[in-house]
Amino acid sequence: MTISQDLFARAQASIPGGVNSPVRAFNGVGGTPLFITKAEGAFTFDADGNRYIDYVGSWGPMIMGHNHPAIKQAVHDAVENGLSYGAPTEAEILMAEKVKELVPSIEKVRMVSSGTEATMSAIRLARGFTGRDKILKFEGCYHGHADSLLVKAGSGALTMGVPNSPGIPEDFAKHTLTVSFNNLDEVKAIFAKYADEIACIIVEPVAGNMNCIPPVPGFLEGLRDVCDEYKSVLIFDEVMTGFRVALGGAQAYYNIKPDLTCLGKVIGGGMPVGAFGGKTEIMDYIAPVGPVYQAGTLSGNPIAMAAGLKSLELLSEPGLHAKLEATSKAICEGFEAGAKKAGIALTTNYAGGMYGFFFTDAEKVTTYKQATECDLERFKRFFHLMLEEGVYLAPSAFEAGFVCAAHNEQEIKDTIAAAERAFAKL
């Protein structure tokens, strides 16, 4: 028995499923999850002493690479003054000012402690601002585990094999309308039917929870136009894409301005941080200046602010995001070439510092339906073959891959060579 196997057995006796977030349990690929003991740069190390080139990156936050010395020092300096105050600090102001600088659509921003809190709060705010109840989301897009958003969600829900979650009252879920991602005609049809009942559209501008699926040309522009026409709030869930697809997020990458933006992952530099922000007229509906209540004991925690601010400062280095996208492109091209050589049908997508690959005959995957129809059994085998090669991919066919600034030429070459050997064994 490996040390990871022993730890997993112990964990299951005290933690539901042995994990504190479902996708970590390896249900999507089978086998025993890796128990990580440390991480450095582009690598993670498990309890059995194995080293892996890491493309999970703590599910997105570690864009500068693991254990970055400058971020670590910023945390150390902040800890010297205390862990949490439950009171305003200058660090919160500096973080808010930095977010506004990098994401111009955000005029005011509220800090929270997770991406789920960010999306949940943004939905409540949109409903309060518009006085409407219904929201529109897309099949396969995951926006955290708030009740109204776990309807035809992607990622963990797909990995579990269920489109929804028990425990959500039907009377509550009925206010969530769902249409196909990348299908503007369905959006227009639902708005024509419900008109002034829809408070907002919430969308991942690049879907990262049915693997990586970018928007088709005109889709995001169309959502902007529909929201303008019906006076609904357009919410970009950039928890995954924020500061990763581009310095200004997917909205900068695709040049579309939402009304509200949800942030998480990268913004915390590895600490638990989320945020939502947008137009002043909407954000001023939040308490204490407005009637929509939102609060959090650890919101704006000084340690988290220090880590996040330093991460955003490092990300502002000229050329860094071009390097990230070049890495994503190289991985995708290498995987496609290796699969073709082995006679295996595979296609890829990428946007900035995130990528995805699909075992399918389709030329491109652009929808949730296509993602669910890919060869999931082949993905499982490939995942374990890559693990044996020392490459740690996301343990689910419905999760995007993440590159980081520490993935250099050697790591890319080693990853592509490992993939070629794995494809040959499939």
UniProtKB/Swiss-Prot annotation:
Necessary cofactors: pyridoxal 5'-phosphate
GO molecular function: glutamate-1-semialdehyde 2,1-aminomutase activity; pyridoxal phosphate binding; transaminase activity
Reaction catalyzed: (S)-4-amino-5-oxopentanoate = 5-aminolevulinate
Subcellular location(s) of the protein: Cytoplasm
Keyword Chloroplast: no
Quaternary structure and interacting proteins, as annotated: Homodimer.
Known pathway: Porphyrin-containing compound metabolism; protoporphyrin-IX biosynthesis; 5-aminolevulinate from L-glutamyl-tRNA(Glu): step 2/2
Keyword list, A-Z: Cytoplasm, Isomerase, Porphyrin biosynthesis, Pyridoxal phosphate
EC class name: isomerase
Gene3D superfamilies per UniProt: Aspartate Aminotransferase, domain 1, Type I PLP-dependent aspartate aminotransferase-like (Major domain)
UniProt family annotation: Belongs to the class-III pyridoxal-phosphate-dependent aminotransferase family. HemL subfamily.
HAMAP family: HemL_aminotrans_3
Record-linked SUPFAM superfamilies: PLP-dependent transferases (SSF53383)
N6-(pyridoxal phosphate)lysine sites (modified residues): K265
NCBIfam families: hemL, PRK00062.1
Organism listed in the record: Pseudoalteromonas translucida (strain TAC 125)
InterPro entries for the chain: 4pyrrol_synth_GluAld_NH2Trfase, Aminotrans_3, Aminotrans_3_PPA_site, PyrdxlP-dep_Trfase, PyrdxlP-dep_Trfase_major, PyrdxlP-dep_Trfase_small
Database matches in Pfam families: Aminotran_3
Gene Ontology biological process terms in this record: protoporphyrinogen IX biosynthetic process
Protein name from the UniProt record: Glutamate-1-semialdehyde 2,1-aminomutase
Gene Ontology CC entries for this record: cytoplasm
EC identifiers of the protein: 5.4.3.8
Superkingdom of origin: Bacteria
Record-linked PROSITE patterns: AA_TRANSFER_CLASS_3 (PS00600)
